[in-house]
Amino acid sequence: MKKFRSYFILILAAAVMTGCSGLNKMKKNSNLVKYEVTPKVLETHAGVVNVTIKGTFPAKYFDKKTTVTATPVLTYTGGETTFDKVQVLQGESVQANNKVITTTGGDFTYTGTIPYKDAMKMSELVLRIKAVRGKKTLDFGPVKIADGVIATSTLVDKDGKPIMSKDNYVRINPESKLADIHYQINQADINSKELKAEDIALLKEYIKSVSVDSSRKLKSTDVSSYASPDGSMKINTPLSEKRGKTADKFIKKEFDKIPVAKTEGFFNEKTTAEDWDGFKSEVEKSSIQDKDLILRVLSMYSDPEVRNKEIKNMTSAFEKLKTDILPQLRRSKMAVNVDIVGRSDEQILAQMKADPTKLNVEEMLRAGSLTKDNNEQLKFYQAAAENNPKDFRAQNNIGCTLMALGKTDEAIASFEKAKAIENNDVIKNNLGFGSLVKGDVAKAEEYFNSMTAATPESKYGLGVIAITKGEYDKAVNDFGTEPSFNLALALYLKGDVAKAKSTLDSMKELCKCGKPSYLKAVIGAKLDDKNYMLSNLREAIGFKADWKAYAKTDLEFAKFFTDDTFKSTVQ
């Protein structure tokens, strides 16, 4: 019996030793396992870090009774994040449904994702490996397989591009005062009765008032004289010219003491021997018998004599024409042309500061566009909104100014007030940018896509959203051809480094935030152009010193981390 018990213990010990030696051997030889990580340096796109790991096991490495669980973990200062799934592998004798690695060797391919955090820039990707054989478990210890995360996609500029509502202020507005002098048939003299007509009296008074009004400037006077088309050209041509002379004489007398009337080209005369256009217009407005027939004659014949003959053949209709239509055509039309001159920009600003209530809404909105001081601009638009509560433009512009001041919540509130007055594409665009700056990408996209017609601004906003989603081709298309930092960033992220560089180089003015200069430095590093990299990195730091610390941990510059010039630049 003692022999049997000793024999059993010996067998059990041998089994345990065999299990342990299998695990220990795998751990000891774990350096023979090869790992390939794609990308070699992790990157964040669309707010996540994706990784592909390919592991290759040599022959006679994987114990056939062992199950191995590999857990990818990203470790960084202050914490760590485990990827969303693990990789389980098993030897060929294990009864389970995991990936089998035989004694002849094998491989696996793993893909996983984690949400990105800023702390992950300087990090290590490790595999934590646990092996199980029967009831025995052995941790192999972490295996480092990659360094850090490149976070260039997070540089996307989410600053808003709200659309200001324009004023419709026009400083100079043309105005014309009209009057007619009518003549007896075949006469060119002005009947004294005509000069007492209401329109003539009003014209005289208008000329006097304008001549002493500094806000109105006399520009010109047009005199157009006509003869009715019921006579011959031989009679009507000199007749219309004589009527022009009498009308011209009359109107010039009214300007006799006004200096501007002495300038060359102030008076313009024109004569029309047969006023067929006027005839047609008067007939169209009338209810005269045979109206349609008369108009048909005009459309069928262009010869004045034929027209006259055909119309005079309509006996009853012609009698009506002689009394109701033709007398209206024997006339001289006078038009005094004036420019109404509004306030200058300087006057608008002065009045806005003194008493804005004396300005109309267009002048108030104009005032807002004349100052570069955002706080003063806000004050002007608030006054415009207070005095014009039904005009959405004032509230909209308040919102735009608040966004420029970094007060996004208040800006959104103003856009909502504007929306309550008039919900249009401008408001949708601006609410979209308000949501984008606040980080509500889904809401921003909803606003932009709800617009009746896309604008360059809304397409820009959709381009920003596309970058945050990792849709770089779409972003490039949305941004269009206008050089911008975000366009260059999208080009770089999609792999078109040369075009990204040319886009940045063609920008007329670089943002004082330093982002364009910093991206240039990143491109310089990518192209291994040390001088280009350093000069632009220094420029970025000159704009904003924070880029020093950022560059220190940016793996875009990994190849230069030991370079003395780089180190001195970011110290």
Map each language-model feature to its residues:
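N-terminal targeting segments with Sec-dependent signals, encompassing both cleavable signal peptides
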Residues: K2-C513, K520, G524, D529-S535, ...
